[in-house]
Amino acid sequence: MIVSFGDATTRTSEVQLVRCTQGLNLWKLHQVHAVYKRVVHDTLGADEGNALLDQILADTNLYPPWMCVLLYAFCSAMVTPYAFGGDWVNLAISFFMGLCVGSLQFILSQKSYMYSNVFEISASIVVSFCGRAFGSIPRSHICFGAVTQGSLALILPGYIILCGALELQSRSLVAGAVRMFYAIIYSLFLGFGITLGSALFGWMYHNATNEISCPQLISPWFRFLFVPAFTISISLLNQAHISQLPVMVFISCTGYVVTYWAGKHFANSTEFTAALAAFVIGVLGNLYSRIWKGLAVSAMLPAIFVQVPSGIASQNSLLSGLQSANTIVNANETITTSTSDPSSSMSFGMTMIQVCVGISVGLFASSLFVYPFGKKKTGLFSL
């Protein structure tokens, strides 16, 4: 974390680099915002506020690691049908594979610092290998693309790219450039892991599946069930309190409705669809902050997490590594896929940037729409 302290009298600034583990805790974020408002409005002293912040940092998380593993698996199961076109069988397989990835992230990575450095690559290798193995079972109706993307949806660097795009748009060039570059390399790691896992199974079983698209077997009306369920589970996974869930679910579902119908009319414009949905999400979140005095950023984040898998699914860019794996295993065989640039995993990173740039533009436009002159009494706690 890079913190800059400016001095208006001398026109100088001091930059401090704070080393801390990256994470998101929506309930503690709400508590910190409440302390901030009390200090700004002189209902609480600075020393007492500092003591409360230390107490908030020392408090344990609302949900233990084993519950986070179950929530991760449930998130993977819920995102598979509405974002990646999986059916009920793929939903069950995604839950099982989500358990494996969640165990690697919340249990093994927390115990081993060395493994945490290679978690993303190892998880993508395991998921792509197992997903292609399940998809190659004859007459199983298991879709390799759906179960693989659903299991990896929660470790996509969408939040990192979004923060980088927002910082670049607000002229924070150093922090934004660092985040964007890190997210691109992170995307390449995921693409390499998918390629390696798919190629390993292709070497072992020459009749491995090459299908990445799935027939839509579940009625679109079930999205009214899957999207709220995914929103609730990913909010709890990010340590949200139950009292925060109603507004999160409402904003998330409204944003997804905009994404769904905008995607019908702008099928080849992922960033424009993301910008429209982000604008609606930002307007609702900022109105929640302005009228009901809530915390906009915590109410909007789960809705943004819903948008990222939808944008990735529109181009199947996460599975661009499958074509590379087929090229490695079957050097003389030509296989056609639906990806826009299947020979390179860079297409995945570019799709992530397109989606997140669209989201950042929509969020800035929504803040300008609700707060055209900014907030005078306190800071704007929004995205």
Swiss-Prot record:
<feature type="transmembrane region" description="Helical">
    <location>
        <begin position="272"/>
        <end position="292"/>
    </location>
</feature>
<dbReference type="Pfam" id="PF06738">
    <property type="entry name" value="ThrE"/>
</dbReference>
<comment type="similarity">
    <text>Belongs to the ThrE exporter (TC 2.A.79) family.</text>
</comment>
<dbReference type="InterPro" id="IPR010619">
    <property type="entry name" value="ThrE-like_N"/>
</dbReference>
<feature type="topological domain" description="Extracellular">
    <location>
        <position position="87"/>
    </location>
</feature>
<feature type="transmembrane region" description="Helical">
    <location>
        <begin position="181"/>
        <end position="201"/>
    </location>
</feature>
<keyword id="KW-0472">Membrane</keyword>
<feature type="transmembrane region" description="Helical">
    <location>
        <begin position="66"/>
        <end position="86"/>
    </location>
</feature>
<feature type="transmembrane region" description="Helical">
    <location>
        <begin position="242"/>
        <end position="262"/>
    </location>
</feature>
<feature type="transmembrane region" description="Helical">
    <location>
        <begin position="142"/>
        <end position="162"/>
    </location>
</feature>
<feature type="topological domain" description="Extracellular">
    <location>
        <begin position="139"/>
        <end position="141"/>
    </location>
</feature>
<dbReference type="GO" id="GO:0022857">
    <property type="term" value="F:transmembrane transporter activity"/>
</dbReference>
<feature type="transmembrane region" description="Helical">
    <location>
        <begin position="118"/>
        <end position="138"/>
    </location>
</feature>
<dbReference type="GO" id="GO:0016020">
    <property type="term" value="C:membrane"/>
</dbReference>
<feature type="topological domain" description="Extracellular">
    <location>
        <begin position="202"/>
        <end position="216"/>
    </location>
</feature>
<feature type="transmembrane region" description="Helical">
    <location>
        <begin position="294"/>
        <end position="314"/>
    </location>
</feature>
<feature type="topological domain" description="Extracellular">
    <location>
        <begin position="263"/>
        <end position="271"/>
    </location>
</feature>
<feature type="topological domain" description="Cytoplasmic">
    <location>
        <begin position="1"/>
        <end position="65"/>
    </location>
</feature>
<feature type="topological domain" description="Cytoplasmic">
    <location>
        <begin position="163"/>
        <end position="180"/>
    </location>
</feature>
<dbReference type="InterPro" id="IPR024528">
    <property type="entry name" value="ThrE_2"/>
</dbReference>
<feature type="transmembrane region" description="Helical">
    <location>
        <begin position="217"/>
        <end position="237"/>
    </location>
</feature>
<feature type="topological domain" description="Cytoplasmic">
    <location>
        <position position="293"/>
    </location>
</feature>
<dbReference type="GO" id="GO:0005783">
    <property type="term" value="C:endoplasmic reticulum"/>
</dbReference>
<keyword id="KW-1133">Transmembrane helix</keyword>
<feature type="topological domain" description="Cytoplasmic">
    <location>
        <begin position="374"/>
        <end position="383"/>
    </location>
</feature>
<protein>
    <recommendedName>
        <fullName>Pheromone-regulated membrane protein 10</fullName>
    </recommendedName>
</protein>
<keyword id="KW-0812">Transmembrane</keyword>
<feature type="topological domain" description="Cytoplasmic">
    <location>
        <begin position="109"/>
        <end position="117"/>
    </location>
</feature>
<feature type="topological domain" description="Cytoplasmic">
    <location>
        <begin position="238"/>
        <end position="241"/>
    </location>
</feature>
<feature type="topological domain" description="Extracellular">
    <location>
        <begin position="315"/>
        <end position="352"/>
    </location>
</feature>
<dbReference type="Pfam" id="PF12821">
    <property type="entry name" value="ThrE_2"/>
</dbReference>
<dbReference type="InterPro" id="IPR051361">
    <property type="entry name" value="ThrE/Ser_Exporter"/>
</dbReference>
<feature type="transmembrane region" description="Helical">
    <location>
        <begin position="353"/>
        <end position="373"/>
    </location>
</feature>
<feature type="transmembrane region" description="Helical">
    <location>
        <begin position="88"/>
        <end position="108"/>
    </location>
</feature>
